[in-house]
Swiss-Prot record:
Keyword Ribosomal protein found: no
Binding site residues for Zn(2+): H73, H75, H243, D318
Main location: cytoplasm
InterPro entries named among the record's database cross-references: Amidohydro-rel, HutI, Metal-dep_hydrolase_composite, Metal_Hydrolase
Name of encoding gene: hutI
Reactions catalysed, as given in the entry: 4-imidazolone-5-propanoate + H2O = N-formimidoyl-L-glutamate
Residue numbers binding 4-imidazolone-5-propanoate: R82, Y145, H178, Q246, S323
Cofactors, names only: Zn(2+); Fe(3+)
Name of the molecule in the record: Imidazolonepropionase
The UniProt record lists the keyword Transmembrane helix: no
Gene Ontology cellular-component terms listed: cytoplasm
Length: 408
């Protein structure tokens, strides 16, 4: 056998549903890489003969390999911060009250409109580095802090550039319908027209987005407006997803599922009809425990119903300056378990296999199987549950991305 690298003295949490063991585990395992792909994986005792003198061999010291982590929902490119709003919330103001008084998303919009691409790139690079240190190898980045053509395109260009200059893969999402800008305060339909007829065509022309998202909520866009944007995006050949049922139940998840959305995100107020719709369409349910925690919410997503109907649950950071300024995917694993009562295995699946499905890249990454991209992390842990159980100990030792070793 001729391989580019071989990993031994490891255990592997493949996260493959085809292996009955928890985490799809293979103990005392080995893994071989060739041309950026996993060429062989299995028990070490079954490892075929290969040229040990010509092949780099990496010893994992009985640690665990997992798929590279995938953060499938972030707003990572932004300027400014909203620490003052944090203080207001602790004094009793609600997220909705702050938004209705010109704070919230709009304050970040103003900062992003003033920032240039170089500033946004450097801020984004620092945040991407922080996630990468925790084993994240793929990140989704949304726009939505421009709310005008120039700034929305600027944010998406920066996100694309980050993907070109960093080992972390970046998937971009156009979220022009994130909030109603002040200049359209009294005519939100006209702003929706702008998103559909002017912003979206330019985003497509520059190939700046892999998907389109909308914030469907009483303080943002109505169900009818949301459907218009998602339908236009779908007709243009883009994937669609939705911020839905975070503060109330408008039926956005059902509508998005019928349109074939990859995911619906937040979903604290999702009901059983909505869960059924997700199950029937194969749409993922993205849980955002950081926002749930930071906003001190009490309405939990319907975890038991999602289990009952076998809806793939995704766990993501929702990293943003207002409702989840928490740039840590490992912290999200812990919060998903402690706050939302996921099992550690469900949480890890939510940042690997299911997160890949939510981004439409499940044929490439998210599980460790022969033929998949060699995209994995080595952790200094004795069981995969430690990734959710403990936090802050720096247990990610090495990362391999596209078959290339990325030194920590």
């Amino acid at each position: 056998m001729s391989w580019d690298q071989v990993w031994i003295d490891i255990n592997i949490a493949t996260m493959s549903p085809n292996i009955s063991e928890p985490y799809g585990a293979i103990r005392d395992a080995a893994l071989a890489v060739k041309d950026g792909k996993i060429a062989w994986i299995g028990k070490r005792c079954d490892l075929p003969e290969f040229d040990v003198l010509a092949t780099p061999i990496y010893k994992g010291k009985n640690g665990w390999l997992t798929p590279g982590l995938i953060d499938a929902h972030t707003h990572l490119v932004f300027a400014g911060n909203r620490a003052n709003e944090f203080e207001l919330r602790l004094q009793g103001a609600s997220y909705e009250e702050i938004a209705r008084n010109g704070g919230g998303i709009i304050s970040t919009v103003n900062a992003c409109r003033e920032a240039d691409e170089a500033e946004l790139f450097e801020l984004g690079r620092q945040r991407l580095n922080a996630l990468a240190k925790e084993g994240v190898t793929t990140v989704e980045i949304k726009s939505g802090y421009g709310l005008d053509i120039e700034t929305e395109l600027k944010i998406l260009r920066v996100a694309r550039e980050l993907g070109k200059h960093h080992h972390v893969d970046v998937k971009t999402t156009f979220l022009g319908a994130h909030a109603i800008p002040p200049e359209y305060k009294n005519d939100s339909d006209a702003y929706v027209d702008l998103v559909i007829n002017e912003m979206l065509p330019q985003v497509i022309a520059e190939n700046l987005a892999d998907a389109v998202d909308v914030f469907c909520e009483n303080i943002a866009f109505s169900l009818a407006q949301t459907e218009r944007v998602l339908t236009a995006a779908k007709n243009a050949g883009l994937d669609i997803k939705l911020h839905a049922e975070q503060l109330s139940n408008l039926g956005g998840s059902e509508m998005a599922a019928k349109l074939g959305a990859k995911s619906v995100d937040h979903i604290e107020y999702l009901d059983e009809d909505g869960v059924k719709a997700l199950s029937e369409s194969g749409t993922c349910a993205t849980l955002l425990p950081g926002a749930f925690y930071f906003l001190r919410e009490t309405q939990l997503p319907p975890i038991e119903l999602l289990r009952q109907y076998k809806v793939p649950m995704v766990v993501a950071s929702d990293y943003n300056p207002g409702s989840s300024p928490l740039c840590s995917s490992l912290l999200m694993l812990n919060m998903a378990c402690t706050l939302m009562r996921l099992t550690p295995e469900e949480a890890l699946a939510g940042m690997t296999r299911n997160a890949a499905k939510a981004l439409g890249i499940e044929a490439e990454v998210g599980v460790l199987e022969t033929g998949m991209t060699a995209d994995f992390c080595l952790w200094n842990i004795s069981t995969p549950a430690e990734l959710s159980y403990t936090y802050g100990v720096g247990s990610c030792i090495e990362v391999v991305k596209n078959g290339r070793l990325v030194h920590q």
